[in-house]
Amino acid sequence: MSIFDRMTTSKEAAMKYRQFCVSKKKEVWDALIYHAKYAKNIEKVYDMTTVLQRVQQECLMFALEKGVGQPDIRDAAELIFPLAMQKVVIKVLRPYFMSHFTNYRLAMYLPHRKIDHGIDLNQELWTPEKKEICGQYVQDFNPFVNELKTGILNANRHMNAALSVYIRELAATLVMHEKAAFDNELRCSMFQEIMESLRIWSDQVTMQDAFHLISDTIYKDVFQMLSKNAYEMIAVDFPVKFRSLITMKYCLLRTNNHGRVDFTNYLIDQVNTKLLVASVDTKDILKAYAACVESLREMDNSCVVMHKVCGVIREYLKRRPDTVQQIISYITSNKKNELEKDMSLQSKTVRSAMMDEEELKGVNDDFLPENMETLGWENWMPNPTDATVGDGAPGHQGVDVFNMLVSVYGSKELFVKEYRNLLAERLSSSDNKDPEFEKRYLDLLKLRFQYSELQHCEVMLRDVIHSLDIDKKFEDMSERSAGNYDVPIIPISACIISSHYWPKLETEKTEALMPQPLQAAMDVYQETYLDVKRDRKLEWLRSVGCVEVSINIDGVEVDRTIPNMYALLLFLFLEKETWTTAEVVEKMGMSVVVTRKRLEWLVKQGFICMNPIISSDTWTLTRNPSGISIVRPGTPDLEDDEDVEPEENSDMVDALEQYWGYTRNFIANHAPNGEVKAERMHRVYRMFGSPTSAGPTLDHVSAFLQRKVALGLLTCINGSYRIIQEKKDGE
């Protein structure tokens, strides 16, 4: 039964009513198209409303006159606005609703609202009267909407789809306008204002459902748009584009993390293409790595994206030979202020993240007591579906830049060892020594590590601070003892170290006497130390340290800083200006090879010159002060001196040979990459019991593994050892 059969039993009457409604279709469509051109004028909207009401009345009167009965308006609407023509209906109604939104924006314009920033209005045309007219337009527009929804057109079937399209289009326009007005950046507060404004507008036209139908799509559109420049925002421009990342975070929250998987894969692809290439310096990769940690941690509270993206960077960094040294330098120099703040604020909540990966295996860190107390276990949420096992756990969500950088090492022991070496280098340098900063930074490290792990660093720093106190006492002592020596006492600043706690220094034993002024100063310093520390004595490392010298050549004074081992030879030229190699060897008690190499270094620096006219073994003090180059502490290489065997216990290393078969199988079968670090093997060896009474140290284990590297049985890349697979016959 058709819709007209329900109105009357007369087929002839039904057909006449159908023909009459179809005849009104062209009249309605022509009126809609005509008045749409002038929709910004509310009078034209009134006229269109009148047309719709008149057509509806004519249809009803025709039905009564022809005996059709009481027809259903929806039946007539299907003939005039058929559902199959929905796209055309949406296009025809667009000018009306866009004009309404324009008047709504102008009527609601407030300069202090974020969404209205950047709008340029013609002050001559913008008056309170104009604003009142716009407000009246908004109110008078509703009868037209009601007529569309309930009148002869029954357009309520199309309205939700139409308003959804308009809202999506308006959102895109407003978002792009805000980005252009604020340096291509979409701030979350502005985006929220835009969405709230569109929601209120949908309420104004009594179409609230349309906004809720399309809002998720708008959030997805904005997230996808911002994702196109995600690499620059996250790894390059952070924190400049930080506000756009907050907008992305807001979109993820509103859409239940829709698109996060695709975004993660896209970002990993961008990282592999633009960052993880041979032409990018390790420092720049570390900078981008730290930026990714900070930005992605803020954008995604679950840290799923951060762990996936940073995991790719971390695996690449492990294959770079200079990563270990660059990380410790980056942490303690380039980013020390930011990391200091980060460490102090989050130290209590991330201690568990500092555990070794080996120690974390098999541990359910969701239920660590410390995490329960600090991370709010009562608000526990399950891990996201796209999270790798373990990445959503509280122990991983609490990580920060410091922890993520340290994780590249693979173990805390390696980080502490490298930090100890760097600290020794910086504390023993006279150029950039800063005990106060090192003390403050070490105190922060104590919040992340156990005291026993940093005990060596604590003692080293205490030695330096104590040495500064001795230096001050030495100044007073030198003034009182000046009359006891034939030469003036030159100032000395010494670093008194506890050799057991400091890294092994490259030194040489020499019996050569120091120059008389320097020896006198050393004697006074020794007396000063004995006054402070009874029953102790100093053992001077004569080849370590630097001397600040002032050379006067023909009235031109040149100030330079040179290492002690070279200054000893230079002081000889105060006695006479020309020396032979044999005379220097006899005077200093050094070998001929070492003597010649050090004299050649002085020649290279411009302090002395050879006199080939007299003899190739004759050395003369220079007469050209401009030829003396600038020398900084540590510039000469010690490798030019005589080869010295390392002081290691070879018996202890040989004793580890009995475990080589087990070691080879352990490394080959070690998951996931078939590689281990020396620290891990050290812990394994301790499980078996010490091969000797003292037991192997980490240095012994490292020496044993390096021996296997030299034999071609292992490879070592960035501190990780791997078995070299034997090639089969015919390969």
Curated annotation (Swiss-Prot):
Pathway: Protein modification; protein ubiquitination
Cystine crosslinks: none
GO terms under biological process: anaphase-promoting complex-dependent catabolic process; cell division; meiotic cell cycle; metaphase/anaphase transition of mitotic cell cycle; protein K11-linked ubiquitination; regulation of meiotic cell cycle; regulation of mitotic cell cycle
Pfam families in UniProt: Cullin
PANTHER family on file: ANAPHASE-PROMOTING COMPLEX SUBUNIT 2
Family: Belongs to the cullin family.
Record note on quaternary structure: The APC/C is probably composed of at least 12 subunits: apc-2, apc-10, apc-11, cdc-26, emb-1, emb-27, emb-30, mat-1, mat-2, mat-3, such-1 and gfi-3.
Protein name: Anaphase-promoting complex subunit 2
Organism from which the protein derives: Caenorhabditis elegans
